[in-house]
Protein backbone atom coordinates (compact mmCIF):
# COMPACT_ATOMS: atom_id res chain seq x y z
CA UNK A 1 0.00 0.00 0.00
CA UNK A 2 1.07 3.54 -0.69
CA UNK A 3 0.35 6.60 1.40
CA UNK A 4 -1.37 9.28 -0.68
CA UNK A 5 -2.53 12.86 -0.30
CA UNK A 6 -5.79 13.75 -2.05
CA UNK A 7 -6.98 17.30 -2.58
CA UNK A 8 -10.70 17.84 -3.22
CA UNK A 9 -11.99 20.67 -5.42
CA UNK A 10 -13.34 23.59 -3.41
CA UNK A 11 -16.83 23.30 -4.92
CA UNK A 12 -17.19 19.86 -3.27
CA UNK A 13 -16.11 20.88 0.25
CA UNK A 14 -19.71 20.92 1.46
CA UNK A 15 -19.85 17.21 0.51
CA UNK A 16 -16.43 16.29 1.92
CA UNK A 17 -17.76 13.57 4.22
CA UNK A 18 -19.73 11.99 1.38
CA UNK A 19 -16.71 12.15 -0.94
CA UNK A 20 -14.52 10.53 1.74
CA UNK A 21 -17.08 7.73 2.17
CA UNK A 22 -17.13 7.15 -1.61
CA UNK A 23 -13.34 6.94 -1.73
CA UNK A 24 -13.37 4.54 1.24
CA UNK A 25 -15.82 2.29 -0.62
CA UNK A 26 -13.40 2.35 -3.58
CA UNK A 27 -10.72 0.90 -1.30
CA UNK A 28 -9.02 3.92 0.27
CA UNK A 29 -7.93 3.43 3.87
CA UNK A 30 -8.52 6.88 5.32
CA UNK A 31 -5.99 8.13 7.85
CA UNK A 32 -7.26 11.70 8.20
CA UNK A 33 -9.78 14.05 6.59
CA UNK A 34 -9.08 17.78 6.86
CA UNK A 35 -12.05 20.15 6.56
CA UNK A 36 -10.16 22.30 4.04
CA UNK A 37 -10.38 19.49 1.47
CA UNK A 38 -7.37 17.25 2.01
CA UNK A 39 -7.65 13.52 2.64
CA UNK A 40 -4.66 11.48 3.77
CA UNK A 41 -4.92 7.76 3.19
CA UNK A 42 -3.40 4.54 1.96
CA UNK A 43 -4.33 2.56 -1.13
CA UNK A 44 -3.14 -0.09 -3.55
CA UNK A 45 -2.05 0.99 -7.04
CA UNK A 46 -5.28 -0.20 -8.73
CA UNK A 47 -7.35 1.79 -6.20
CA UNK A 48 -5.21 4.88 -6.80
CA UNK A 49 -5.93 4.67 -10.53
CA UNK A 50 -9.70 4.56 -9.85
CA UNK A 51 -9.60 7.39 -7.32
CA UNK A 52 -7.80 9.69 -9.78
CA UNK A 53 -10.87 9.53 -12.04
CA UNK A 54 -13.30 10.91 -9.46
CA UNK A 55 -14.63 14.32 -10.53
CA UNK A 56 -14.18 15.66 -6.99
CA UNK A 57 -10.42 14.91 -6.92
CA UNK A 58 -8.31 17.96 -7.81
CA UNK A 59 -5.00 16.19 -7.20
CA UNK A 60 -3.61 12.96 -5.88
CA UNK A 61 0.06 12.61 -4.98
CA UNK A 62 2.05 9.89 -3.32
CA UNK A 63 3.56 10.87 0.01
CA UNK A 64 7.32 10.40 -0.39
CA UNK A 65 9.62 9.59 2.50
CA UNK A 66 13.03 11.26 2.48
CA UNK A 67 15.79 10.13 4.81
CA UNK A 68 18.56 12.61 5.51
CA UNK A 69 21.59 11.35 7.41
CA UNK A 70 22.84 13.26 10.45
CA UNK A 71 25.20 16.17 9.68
CA UNK A 72 28.19 14.38 11.20
CA UNK A 73 27.81 11.19 9.12
CA UNK A 74 30.19 10.23 6.31
CA UNK A 75 29.37 11.23 2.75
CA UNK A 76 28.53 8.20 0.65
For each feature predicted by the language model, list its residue ranges.
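Autoinhibitory propeptides
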Residues: 32-76
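Sequence-level detector for tyrosine residue identity
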Residues: 9-12, 34
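Short glycine-/aliphatic-rich beta-strand segments at the starts of folded cytosolic domains
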Residues: 1-10
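Short secondary-structure junctions
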Residues: 25-31
Amino acid sequence: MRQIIITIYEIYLDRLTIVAEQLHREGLVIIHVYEFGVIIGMAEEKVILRIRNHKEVASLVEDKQVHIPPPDSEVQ
